[in-house]
């Protein structure tokens, strides 16, 4: 049973985190293990679990800060990795996209960009050049693209920020379809 007093809850979380970190270190980052994302592009390994735990901790720390009216930006490096981790872990799937095939680009102000392609074969995420970084290269046609800081993109991906708070180019209705999609895998 979870403790109810604040100090006891903080101590329980710290001890639980140390148990998880100890088990992950003992296993090693490449050691295979159970994950809740068997059909994604993320590795089913202790390293994958550790990477995901960083994102969960960052987002839930934001939640706690927002609950007391003092939300802080996510740490930049964690947020940059967080966009990619979310797309590879949560979005990537072999479940068919039930709509017309399309792509979504996610552009972080810090200079990284990712593309999520969705079609009858599912969803796949890749890194793509940031807009304006490749001379003479025309951007690929995408259904919609979302622009913001990496932290804003992570919070958008985890449904902490509505689409209207970020710049969305293209068909904004596609963003609604993506956010509502619940793949079977």
Question: Model features per residue range: what roles?
Answer:
Residues 4-7, 44-51, 144:
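Short, solvent-exposed segments of well-ordered alpha helices
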Residues 35-95, 153:
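Short, contiguous alpha-helical
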Residues 137-185:
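C-terminal interaction segments
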Residues 17, 57, 150:
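Short amphipathic alpha-helical/adjacent loop interface patches that line ligand
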């Amino acid at each position: 049973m979870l403790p109810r007093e604040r100090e006891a809850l903080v101590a329980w979380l710290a001890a639980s985190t140390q148990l998880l970190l100890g088990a992950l270190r003992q296993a090693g980052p490449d050691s295979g293990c159970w994950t809740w994302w068997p059909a994604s592009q993320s590795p089913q390994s202790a390293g994958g679990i550790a990477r995901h735990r960083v994102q969960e901790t960052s987002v839930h720390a934001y939640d706690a800060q927002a609950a007391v009216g003092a939300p802080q930006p996510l740490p930049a490096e964690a947020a940059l990795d967080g966009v990619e981790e979310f797309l590879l872990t949560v979005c990537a799937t072999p479940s068919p996209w039930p709509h017309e095939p399309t792509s979504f680009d996610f552009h972080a102000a810090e200079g990284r960009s990712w593309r999520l392609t969705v079609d009858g074969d599912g969803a796949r995420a890749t890194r793509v050049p940031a807009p304006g970084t490749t001379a003479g290269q025309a951007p690929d046609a995408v259904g919609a693209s979302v622009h913001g800081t990496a932290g804003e993109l992570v919070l958008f991906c985890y449904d902490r920020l509505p689409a209207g708070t970020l710049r969305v180019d293209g068909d904004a209705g596609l963003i609604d379809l993506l956010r509502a999609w619940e793949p079977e895998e």
